[in-house]
Amino acid sequence: MPVPRKPLVTRPEQPSGLLDRYSYVYMVGSSSRRALYTGVTANLNKRVYEHKNDLVEGFARKYKCHRLVYFETFEHISDAIAREKEIKGWRREKKNALVELINPRWKDLSEDWFRVRMPTGPSGFEP
């Protein structure tokens, strides 16, 4: 089995300009690691939020795939769709190996994306 390639970008950026927009292939998994869903999107932040809040019908919701464990960034949606199809055709072991290239502990890569940060008060105390 060939080793999957490591992605070039490990943190998503969501540019405001339409021409600068990226596409993403991502994997969300359940906390038990039993379920793993692969998808494609033009807005990774929004899509991850939808998965975390069970706003998406289907496999990911049914199996509680709330943790972003992997993603790749593409300039063209056609490339992202082709990559999604490629990954979906793999056996589970190969998908696991791909995740573990950048995320060996399978931590939620988006765990800090949706937190509200409180400003530090005058005394330096953070509420």
For the regions a protein language model found, what residue spans apply to each?
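GIY-YIG nuclease catalytic motif and its immediate N-terminal context
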Residues: 1-57, 61-71, 78-85, 102-104, ...
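Short arginine-rich
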Residues: 62, 85-98
